[in-house]
Amino acid sequence: MMKQFVQAGLVACLLAAPASAEPLAKELFGAKTTSSNEHAAPHGGYAKGCLAGGAQLPETGPTWQAMRLSRNRNWGHPETVDFIRDLSAYAAKQEGWAGLYIGDISQPRGGPMLTGHRSHQIGLDVDIWMLAPKRLNLSRTERENISSVSMRRAKGAYVNSKWTRQHHNILKAAARDKRVARIFVFPGAKVQMCKDEKGNRAWLRKIRPWWGHHYHFHVRLACPRGANGCVDQAPPPKGDGCADAERWVADILNPPPPDPNAKPPVKRREYVLADLPKQCATTLSR
């Protein structure tokens, strides 16, 4: 009888234990310090994938500096690196801007991160600081300690006095780039750009309101041509999206009452390697 009781208890403990003892994908990818020895390719989606053959954005270039170097997140698909070079060269032509300060792109082999982002996994996302660079010779220590500046007022309903026409121009140039799928920025900035744009408004479709994103804006590139393992996000709805941004602002200023029937949010499960595209196992090993 006692033996049966002990066996039953052991079975119960095993059933209660985690279904898998596999290490988390974020631990595996977060441990890699260099890119894989493969042809450059994004595998999977922006929030569930990896990056083969990633290219490292140089820490300093003619018109940019990569920030927070200790994170080792200045890796991306070569097309992303080229985009940064191009946009920063444009930014350097704006009054008061020496170029761009670049935040997180991806880890050396992409994949889930130990801290921070859910996306930025396939080398096609890049955070660009709102702070206008005055110089591009910051030391490594300065790049760890300096902070960007917030552009928002009233919890993101409006831009503040630090927002300039130069910010508008840089985001517009990014949105007009054919490589770009969408750009995330706080709602008040989108509404302000809608008010200020007097020309062709087609590019505004790519400017998407989202929570946060007032110290930086987040550029997401489309899957490069020929990247068959890459999963694009659905395109933004047709139109300039300005009315939608105004609804975001209205909800910030006058928050709707909570839904009494809303279910509590389900905690997202942490990915293991088997959850990612099968090519990611190869990317980890090379």
Regions inferred by a protein language model and the residue ranges of each:
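Envelope-exposed proteins and targeting segments
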Residues: 96-98, 122-126, 179, 213-217
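Extended, low-complexity, intrinsically disordered C-terminal regulatory tails
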Residues: 30-32, 83-115, 182-206
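Catalytic cores and adjacent binding grooves of peptidoglycan-active enzymes
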Residues: 25, 138, 142-286
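Sec-dependent signal peptide recognition
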Residues: 3-11
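Active-site acidic/histidine clusters and adjacent loop/turn architecture
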Residues: 36-103, 163-172, 177-180
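N-terminal signal peptide c-region/cleavage motif recognized by signal peptidases
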Residues: 16-18
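Cleaved targeting-peptide boundary
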Residues: 21-30
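Short, surface-exposed glycine/acidic/tryptophan-bearing loops
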Residues: 115-133
